[in-house]
Protein backbone atom coordinates (compact mmCIF):
# COMPACT_ATOMS: atom_id res chain seq x y z
CA UNK A 1 0.00 0.00 0.00
CA UNK A 2 1.42 3.36 -1.09
CA UNK A 3 -0.44 6.23 0.58
CA UNK A 4 -4.09 5.39 -0.04
CA UNK A 5 -3.23 3.46 -3.25
CA UNK A 6 -2.96 -0.32 -3.41
CA UNK A 7 -0.31 -1.63 -5.79
CA UNK A 8 0.15 -4.71 -7.96
CA UNK A 9 2.65 -5.66 -10.65
CA UNK A 10 1.42 -7.79 -13.55
CA UNK A 11 3.39 -9.55 -16.26
CA UNK A 12 2.44 -11.38 -19.46
CA UNK A 13 4.84 -12.32 -22.28
CA UNK A 14 7.18 -9.31 -22.48
CA UNK A 15 4.65 -6.79 -21.09
CA UNK A 16 4.92 -5.38 -17.56
CA UNK A 17 2.10 -3.44 -15.90
CA UNK A 18 2.29 -1.40 -12.70
CA UNK A 19 -1.24 -1.01 -11.34
CA UNK A 20 -2.42 1.38 -8.62
CA UNK A 21 -5.99 1.18 -7.27
CA UNK A 22 -7.89 3.32 -4.78
CA UNK A 23 -11.52 3.80 -3.83
CA UNK A 24 -13.31 5.81 -6.51
CA UNK A 25 -15.98 5.68 -9.17
CA UNK A 26 -14.57 3.18 -11.68
CA UNK A 27 -12.20 5.19 -13.89
CA UNK A 28 -9.40 3.15 -15.50
CA UNK A 29 -6.49 5.17 -16.91
CA UNK A 30 -3.79 3.32 -18.89
CA UNK A 31 -0.62 5.28 -19.72
CA UNK A 32 -2.50 8.56 -19.30
CA UNK A 33 -5.44 7.58 -21.56
CA UNK A 34 -8.89 6.21 -20.74
CA UNK A 35 -8.94 2.44 -21.17
CA UNK A 36 -11.32 2.56 -24.16
CA UNK A 37 -8.87 4.83 -26.00
CA UNK A 38 -5.80 2.76 -25.14
CA UNK A 39 -7.10 -0.72 -26.00
CA UNK A 40 -8.78 -0.88 -29.40
CA UNK A 41 -10.08 -4.46 -29.20
CA UNK A 42 -13.18 -5.32 -27.22
CA UNK A 43 -11.54 -8.57 -26.06
CA UNK A 44 -8.68 -6.60 -24.49
CA UNK A 45 -11.16 -4.45 -22.57
CA UNK A 46 -12.98 -7.59 -21.42
CA UNK A 47 -9.72 -9.23 -20.27
CA UNK A 48 -8.77 -6.16 -18.20
CA UNK A 49 -12.17 -5.97 -16.48
CA UNK A 50 -12.45 -9.70 -15.62
CA UNK A 51 -11.05 -9.57 -12.04
CA UNK A 52 -13.18 -6.51 -11.20
CA UNK A 53 -16.37 -8.15 -12.48
CA UNK A 54 -15.59 -11.43 -10.70
CA UNK A 55 -15.22 -9.65 -7.35
CA UNK A 56 -18.12 -7.20 -7.99
CA UNK A 57 -15.79 -4.18 -7.75
CA UNK A 58 -16.46 -2.84 -11.26
CA UNK A 59 -17.38 0.70 -10.17
CA UNK A 60 -15.61 0.67 -6.78
CA UNK A 61 -12.03 1.60 -7.70
CA UNK A 62 -10.17 4.21 -9.69
CA UNK A 63 -7.28 2.45 -11.42
CA UNK A 64 -4.09 3.99 -12.76
CA UNK A 65 -1.85 1.77 -14.91
CA UNK A 66 1.62 2.17 -16.41
CA UNK A 67 2.26 -0.60 -18.93
CA UNK A 68 5.12 -1.12 -21.36
CA UNK A 69 6.52 -3.85 -23.58
CA UNK A 70 4.72 -6.43 -25.67
CA UNK A 71 1.65 -6.07 -27.84
CA UNK A 72 -1.97 -5.33 -27.11
CA UNK A 73 -2.97 -8.80 -25.88
CA UNK A 74 0.14 -9.19 -23.74
CA UNK A 75 -0.41 -5.77 -22.20
CA UNK A 76 -4.07 -6.56 -21.48
CA UNK A 77 -3.02 -9.78 -19.75
CA UNK A 78 -0.37 -7.92 -17.75
CA UNK A 79 -2.91 -5.31 -16.65
CA UNK A 80 -5.34 -8.07 -15.59
CA UNK A 81 -2.59 -9.74 -13.55
CA UNK A 82 -1.65 -6.41 -11.96
CA UNK A 83 -5.26 -5.56 -11.08
CA UNK A 84 -5.62 -9.01 -9.50
CA UNK A 85 -2.54 -8.49 -7.34
CA UNK A 86 -3.66 -4.98 -6.36
CA UNK A 87 -7.10 -6.33 -5.35
CA UNK A 88 -5.39 -8.96 -3.18
CA UNK A 89 -3.25 -6.17 -1.64
CA UNK A 90 -6.50 -4.31 -0.91
CA UNK A 91 -8.41 -7.32 0.49
CA UNK A 92 -6.71 -10.70 0.98
CA UNK A 93 -10.08 -12.48 1.29
CA UNK A 94 -10.55 -12.04 -2.49
CA UNK A 95 -7.57 -14.30 -3.26
CA UNK A 96 -9.41 -17.70 -3.27
CA UNK A 97 -12.05 -16.60 -5.79
CA UNK A 98 -9.45 -14.89 -8.01
CA UNK A 99 -7.20 -17.93 -7.75
CA UNK A 100 -10.01 -20.32 -8.73
CA UNK A 101 -10.61 -18.18 -11.83
CA UNK A 102 -6.90 -18.46 -12.69
CA UNK A 103 -6.08 -14.75 -12.44
CA UNK A 104 -3.45 -14.98 -9.67
CA UNK A 105 -1.10 -17.32 -11.52
CA UNK A 106 1.24 -15.65 -14.00
CA UNK A 107 0.83 -17.06 -17.51
CA UNK A 108 4.38 -18.34 -18.02
CA UNK A 109 4.06 -19.02 -21.76
CA UNK A 110 6.76 -17.17 -23.69
CA UNK A 111 7.73 -17.11 -27.36
CA UNK A 112 9.94 -20.08 -28.21
CA UNK A 113 13.27 -19.11 -29.74
CA UNK A 114 14.08 -19.73 -33.38
CA UNK A 115 16.49 -22.63 -33.91
CA UNK A 116 19.40 -22.68 -36.34
CA UNK A 117 18.58 -24.57 -39.55
CA UNK A 118 14.83 -24.12 -39.16
CA UNK A 119 12.53 -21.42 -40.56
CA UNK A 120 10.88 -20.69 -37.22
CA UNK A 121 10.98 -22.24 -33.75
CA UNK A 122 9.71 -25.61 -35.02
CA UNK A 123 8.91 -25.13 -38.71
CA UNK A 124 11.50 -26.96 -40.79
CA UNK A 125 12.31 -26.43 -44.44
CA UNK A 126 10.03 -28.28 -46.83
CA UNK A 127 11.27 -31.81 -47.39
CA UNK A 128 11.67 -32.97 -50.98
CA UNK A 129 12.00 -36.68 -51.66
CA UNK A 130 13.45 -36.18 -55.15
From Swiss-Prot:
GO molecular function: RNA binding; structural constituent of ribosome
Source species taxonomy: Bacteria, Pseudomonadati, Pseudomonadota, Betaproteobacteria, Burkholderiales
HAMAP family linked: Ribosomal_uS9_B
Gene3D superfamilies linked: 3.30.230.10
Annotated signal sequence range: none
Pfam families noted in UniProt: Ribosomal_S9
Record key words, sorted: Ribonucleoprotein, Ribosomal protein
Biological process terms in GO annotation: translation
Protein name (database record): Small ribosomal subunit protein uS9
GO cellular component, one term: cytosolic small ribosomal subunit
Gene behind this protein: rpsI
Record-stated family: Belongs to the universal ribosomal protein uS9 family.
Amino acid sequence: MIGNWNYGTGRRKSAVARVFIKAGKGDIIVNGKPIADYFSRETSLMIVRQPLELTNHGQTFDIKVNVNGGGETGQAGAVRHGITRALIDYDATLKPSLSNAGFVTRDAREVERKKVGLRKARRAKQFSKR
